[in-house]
């Protein structure tokens, strides 16, 4: 009997299931995808992962599970604060993970209007790739494969 082949494991951090459903459907034979819908779940899942995949916007996340720029939960934020936090929650979770010593390669799915902002994020939260919506599954799969083989960081 042949030993079971383990697949590279990636944490998908989002407030719904759109990304993880798509990845499991189209890339699931090659990779294992684990859901994480907040900082605590992402940190726990990261311990056995090859990389992290982030949505940017977390509109469906309850306020008591959002983190701010310091990685702290915000108790009953006002509407303006909540809007600001949900619109950048993927970045804030990744920033908190980096501050806690999680150095796994990450991909952030975001259409940023400013290339300078994308470059800043990629430098300050490295290793990070900011992936615009035009990036297809083939490109995403190739990046994941590179991480799994150890040829990318």
Segments from the language model and where they lie:
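Structural motif
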Residues: 13-17, 56, 111, 133-135
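Acidic, metal-coordinating helix/loop segments flanking the phosphotransfer/catalytic sites
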Residues: 17, 35-51, 58-67, 73-79
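A short acidic (Asp/Glu
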Residues: 21-24, 63-66, 117-121
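C-terminal output helix
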Residues: 116-124, 133-152
């Amino acid at each position: 009997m042949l030993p079971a082949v383990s697949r590279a494991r990636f944490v998908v951090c989002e407030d719904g299931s759109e990304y993880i459903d798509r990845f499991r459907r189209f890339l699931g034979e090659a990779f294992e995808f684990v859901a994480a819908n907040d900082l605590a779940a992402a940190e726990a899942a990261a311990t056995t992962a090859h990389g992290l995949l982030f949505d940017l916007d977390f509109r469906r996340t309850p306020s008591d599970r959002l983190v701010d720029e310091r990685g702290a939960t915000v108790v009953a934020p006002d509407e303006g604060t909540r809007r600001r936090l949900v619109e950048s929650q993927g970045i804030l979770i990744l920033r908190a993970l980096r501050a806690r010593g999680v150095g796994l390669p990450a991909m952030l799915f975001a259409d940023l209007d400013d290339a300078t902002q994308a470059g800043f994020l990629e430098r300050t939260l490295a290793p990070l790739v900011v992936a615009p919506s035009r990036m297809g599954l083939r490109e995403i799969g190739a990046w994941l494969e590179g991480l799994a083989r150890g040829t990318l960081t």
